[in-house]
């Protein structure tokens, strides 16, 4: 491929509008990147400089090739890139960025490389200083290089498996200790120059603006560096401290550093000023131990004064970016400093007043930067939470200002509703996660001056509830007015819920108890009013708020610490609810009401069932619930007549709720069921009736198109799975199984699977039901030697897998629908077989003994299903990967002979998948693969021992035909096992070896199986070392096998693990040379000439 053709392809890739042309160009360029002549052609593309896109391709290709280059080539490319950036003018910004990224990666990759006794890649800072002395454009490029270098050094993404995480940390630590502080001080000096010459700088000039922007980014990158390798996620904004090294102390003790960024904020235009606040956010978060007490006070004083000055003038806060970063700065003030320290600041009274005023105004301006409110509420939440621990004699003044904040929050939410309805704006109530987060913050803030909060809530609630009730009684009332009041009441119900749950975190008084009672009563009265309207109309958002409130009441009453005397007294006076059991009855009536009238709303049904589930999961509440009349009603009337969401008119997504419903009913039923079979079968009567009506229908030849029958099957599968989940006792579980098996209901499910195997909406619930039925949860299937239940259940589950597998194998599925249409079902089949065989309730030997082909059939179909899965899909779909490796783990532990009996193609597939698993980043997958491999190779070793055995009674030790065939397959694919040995041994030699115990066990067996190959690997590793270290390395390898016998006993493996631990310690401590760190590379024979680039034609 010539240079002109490459330039055309680049143009097509980035400019063509035809997708086909772009796709073909992309394929051709991917081929070029891996070609042997990529390196010299990249140089030619850069030298010609005819196309910016070609320059981009050259720079990005060189970046990908870094690890395949020799030290000399990397040095040459480094020199060329620096020279190119310095001498070629008017480069496009994306080309500059690509070259800057190349330089940063080269520097990181070669940080410890020595050339002619010089650490050549550690000189980049000195080279960049030459750029800083040039024009504005050169200075900008120099700053970009430093900024990208800091980002690259801070990156935890592994460049390659050969660059371990620990090596990257060593590089980052070395860079931090040698150059990061100098880089930070250099960026600060550039900012000082910009500030001092601000009158002579035109910030509207694009080049000047770009330079200042990059310098500020560089400064922030320095302050955001992962100094101690904690890998904190700055995007999460979880208030982590910045672990500034002690060597940086002078920079932070100098008050001019803080002043610099406050000054820049005042000087810089919008678009740049926010970067200076971002830097202040990081500076505010420096670790407390960097200062002593007096230094910290002085630092905090300057910080609070700077914040106060901004709040006084509100300069720049009309810009959303500035506003957002300033809110983050306010939140960090409290995250890193104690309230007592803030109170000690001389200007604290004035500052807290301004912060309160700013918060109130921000809450009322709810349309402006709504995501920033979180930081303001965080500040107030943290300050209020600290009040009990303050020992300062000075007043904290929070009692004065928090009521203002709460009032602003409540009134701003209420005032927003008419505007949202009138102008059809996005409703914040639709963002449930954000609402919940704010309510959690409010629950703390509200408890400061709680009587004021309660009085305000009562005042607003009474007014809105009265107006709402009047509207409902007014004929032909405006529906918009009704909606507005319903949404306003929704906010008030949410806020009241947050207020009463806040009592769980503080010591409450009788007065507070009475206030909570008043709030609870009002919401319950509103609930009674809205329930009376339900046959005609209802507000979904208000119902969700009431459910959230009831959940808070549940938490309050389930807490042993909460005082409830006054609350119960008021509930008794108003509603006649004299004790907790009557309150639970009241809540359950609401649950039944919702299930009856809100069947059309998936969100309300789901939240209602979640509330029922929470009530049924705790022993204390179950004990009280089980006796309630309302609960007995649910246990005897769970039909679509009383609960419409159980009918066939529900959508498929709504039917998912049914599992949760029956899990809750199952818990309530099991509480005092004991061995009462009659009561259990009475409970099952609605399900029995459905099965009986399906029995004859399912045999009809026209059933395939019967949508109602299909929905009944889906509903039954979900119901039964929900019911099976809480049946942990063997007696109750046996009742369920016998009902299913002896009433011939399982064949109906098998028939449904046969009919609708192509439809995941049917197959997934049925497969999940069987996965639960075969799960030996709390040994519910084990222990009864007189019962054939385990065998019978396994046979039915095997039939299901065989029916599904045979149908799905012949079904064509498009790639984009592969997971939902096929792979998800296959994963559940793996889970069913794993649960069956791993439950230890099926004696698999009896099948062969009595000529039953159940086990062979299911293993054969599983083998066929395995072969339909592409290896890449095992990595791409985590649930499939987990189910697959868990099944293999189960089979290899107790049923390895069945793995050996698989057809050769399936066994080879398994070996290849283990190879993939050993390269996986997920530790669970890696450990699982090591365990599976250990079982398989140990079995191979024992079979080979048996083959050459001289045991007197040869008949006991002879190989059957299956094992002879198995050993032939192993022999033909020995390179797979050898490659895994190589992978495991390579892992041992890495600095951050994972799961040493797990991987040492299969490694020993592989060494015993393939001694010659191990010897060749060992020799190659030893020869790769410098001559003076080879003898030492050889001795360490000899010591690795000291005391190791030729067997695969646990004792022998333990000894090898101990030896390997010593071996690893010695190898990791051996100083590495650059010669030893190399890999094969598909590169050209010629080097990269560091010649002068041609001048750019443009």
UniProtKB/Swiss-Prot annotation:
Classification via SUPFAM superfamilies: ARM repeat
UniProt keyword Transcription present: no
Natural source organism: Drosophila melanogaster (Fruit fly)
Protein's UniProt name: Ran-binding protein 16
Family recorded in the similarity comment: Belongs to the exportin family.
Matches recorded under InterPro entries: ARM-like, ARM-type_fold, Importin-beta_N, XPO4/7-like
PANTHER family membership: EXPORTIN 4,7-RELATED, EXPORTIN-7 ISOFORM X1
Complex formation: Binds to nucleoporins and the GTP-bound form of Ran.
Localisation: Cytoplasm; Nucleus
Pfam families linked to this entry: IBN_N (PF03810)
